Amino acid sequence: MKTIILDGSNIIRRQYLSCGKKPDFAQESPMESQLVQMMSQFREDGTRIEIYFDGPKRPTWHKDDWVEVFFSGHKKADDLIVNTVAELAENYGQEVTIITQDYQLQQRCKTYGADVITTNNFWQNYQNCYEYQTISPAWAQN
């Protein structure tokens, strides 16, 4: 089984900054649910998708059948991501791909054998799929 883990807060932060805004992770953002919906489109058999967000669980959050979402509460989402990568790699021998622009998080996850895709490459790949109407981006394929 393959697991794709997204640093959701990092991805959203970069989108907000590209629009000249600063996100507030203490409050719900429409971009959170949009990211989950987008990822559920690319789910393939044998691939698990997890998205991690900083901050408290959202009271209006709806569970998605294809994408598992985690909120860090008072902890850092980065630490939860690293713990998950370590567990999946060491205990289950799973292939893990991390999507983040955070260099320190990338390095921490690589120590457990995770593949890394930068947020910039993630968006570029997604836009190419949308533009050329391909079925799924390379990072989602087994």
Predicted ranges, named:
Residues K2-I4, N10-N142:
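Nuclease catalytic cores that cleave nucleic-acid phosphodiester bonds
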